[in-house]
Regions:
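Glycine-rich phosphate-binding loops of nucleotide-dependent enzymes
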Residues: 2-261
């Protein structure tokens, strides 16, 4: 099926300097609803800088970000989240001392009135809704009253992703979501990523694991020295080609580049 004509996210000529260093040089990127775009590149390629700009942690020196064709200015991470962009970083923003439900609703807790006067957290309803959400997403966390510190790495990752879904994310940026996970836990996270596509979420997926990239992504965008080096349709590529482009920043002569705008 052809993607919609208007991308959910359009990044146009994004440039970022740190002193005299140009970390990003006129980078362009489109992401459509219901697709996974892999963002690839070696260390120092510019991936982290780009996702921090999209997350509102940095502001670009040049260029613009558009959502649904509307130019956006994210001065803070809160601005980005209010625009529907959520980022799940490697260092998960979870509170180990709180339970699963409390983490899902952290910052947007449901309340009830005691004696119709005093507002109080409605823990019962939050746990009910948390159970329903995790069930709908097929997330394997049997008890929502369990402390997060007692969860496995895969469960913690799934919880952070589920929190973004509950907060009505439209674009989810996932930074190394399977790093340090075992085989079984990785499988569950990849299955969750695939299921999010059916919910029409747009996903930017950053990983050094090319096996995962080839399985879950629709397109691959490769950065090299702060520039967009290549864009490929994943099903038409393979591990050897992606490795070569990441290292050299170039495609073979027989392989046309889709876009280096």
């Amino acid at each position: 099926m052809e993607p919609p004509k208007c991308p959910l996210l359009s990044v146009r000529d994004i440039t970022k300097y740190f002193g005299g260093i140009r970390a990003l040089d006129r980078v362009n990127l489109d992401v459509y609803e219901g697709e996974v775009v892999a963002l690839l590149g070696d260390n120092g390629a510019g991936k982290s800088t780009l996702i921090k700009i999209l997350a509102g942690a940095y502001q670009p020196d040049e260029g613009e970000i558009q959502l649904d064709g509307k130019t956006m200015l994210f001065r803070t991470p809160r601005d980005a989240m209010e625009g529907g962009i959520h980022t799940v970083f490697q260092e998960l923003s979870l509170c180990d001392n709180l339970d699963v439900a409390a983490n899902l609703f952290l910052g947007s807790e449901l309340e009830k009135k005691v004696f119709n006067l005093v507002p109080w957290f409605d823990h019962f309803r939050m746990r009910q809704e948390a159970t329903t959400l995790l069930h709908d997403l097929a997330v394997d966390i049997p008890r929502v009253d369990r402390r997060v510190r007692d969860l496995s790495g895969g469960q913690r990752q799934a919880l952070a992703i589920s929190k973004a879904v509950r907060e009505k994310s439209r674009l989810l940026i996932m930074d190394e979501p399977t790093a340090a996970l075992g085989v079984a836990q990785t499988r569950k996270v990849l299955d969750l990523v695939q299921s999010l596509k059916t919910r029409n979420l747009a996903i930017i997926y950053i990983s050094h694991n090319l096996h995962d990239i080839l399985e879950v992504s629709d397109r691959c965008v490769v950065l090299k020295n702060g520039r967009k080096a290549a864009e490929l349709t994943t099903r038409e590529s393979d591990k050897e080609e992606l490795t070569s482009v990441i290292l050299t920043g170039e495609l073979t002569e027989a392989r046309p580049n889709q876009s280096t705008r």
